[in-house]
Amino acid sequence: VYVITKEEQREPVEKYLQSYPLENIKFYYVDIPNFYKKIFKGFMYSGRLNVWNRRVLPLAKKICTDQKIDVIHQITPIEFRAIGDYGKIANIKFVCGPLGGGESLPNGLKDYAKGHEIIEVVRSGINRWYRFKLRITGKLNHCDYIMFANRETRDFLGLDGNVPLVTEIAADEISIEEKTVPNDINNELVFLFAGRMVYRKGLDLLFDAIMEIPDEWKYMVKIVGTGPELSHLRHRCESNSLLSAHVQFMGAVEYSEMQREYEMSDVLIMPSIRETTGTVLIEAMSQGMPIITINKFGGAILVDENTGWLYSGENQKSYIAGLKNAMVACIVNPKEVERRGQNARKKVKDYTWKRKCDQYEKIYKRLNCN
């Protein structure tokens, strides 16, 4: 196996290899000028990735020739705007994905992007431009096998429903364990949000839903993370007695400490208004937590009525009601929370890294047999 990755990955990769030596794998590290790193940031990151892909292509061609490579798999990044030209290399099969990035704000939730409209408009324009480029260059036709991380991206690019949906995230088998810490210390249900506090994570939507739940009900919503929206969200809680009574800001929590947060919580809420999938979903499910999330994006692939609650809507009011109703269903029926949590842990066994590697290996072998 030959891996080409970014120069920024050299230190963590080599540190890992010192502790866990691997055979039959070789790493190459490719960098790009800092000029491009300064220009292409945030939602413009695809520009940086495409510069990197162009610099990688000659190296990939040489490795394919020298080592008689059978398959190239561009696994990351998952955004469709950054597909390389590796499918043009002679005598190899090109696997691409899972791809995301074609998601957009659902109708009814666009008000939650107030103050950030320019980002969504520019991003939408960039997506349409790259979709046009894919069509005129026929780049997707050079993919021997392609996967998508969510329906929204597949539909945006106009591919039919036979193209497989494969989540880009997975769990370590060792992390799929039975809960050992009871959550009912205070006889209240504990919801958990974990993620960066940016507008598209939907925390204002979550707060609007909380304000529809009767104040006297016993539950708590823990918010783990930090970000540019933190000040606004804190102020909103401090200004409302209902929110301040039911919302607790935990701040930034180290990854190594998140296990404890999962153990001390009952249900994970991911109220994102735009998301590819979200690693936190797999992490929570592996800890026996059911999920509440929108019936869109990658979460709609992972979660069903046996492992969590999916809410839908046609306008802002109905989305708020949908999220509120899902939370209420958890509060009034903790045994159902436990049942769906157990099912979530069972389901995540189909989404381990080993299972994913086995699936990829079958794809590679099938392509080479053909």
What is the predicted function of each stretch?
Residues 234-253:
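Nucleotide-activated donor-binding/catalytic signature segment of Leloir-type glycosyltransferases, i.e.
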Residues 273:
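Aromatic "clamp/platform" in nucleotide-sugar-dependent glycosyltransferases that forms part
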Residues 252-253, 260-265:
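Short alpha-helical donor nucleotide-sugar binding micro-motif in glycosyltransferases
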Residues 290-293:
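Short hydrophobic beta-strand element within catalytic cores of glycosyltransferases
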Residues 99, 183-201, 207-210, 222:
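Conserved donor-binding/catalytic core segment of Leloir-type glycosyltransferases
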Residues 336-350, 362, 366:
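A short, well-ordered alpha-helix in the C-terminal region of glycosyltransferases
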Residues 26-29, 96, 125-179, 186:
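Donor nucleotide-sugar binding/catalytic pocket of nucleotide-sugar-dependent glycosyltransferases
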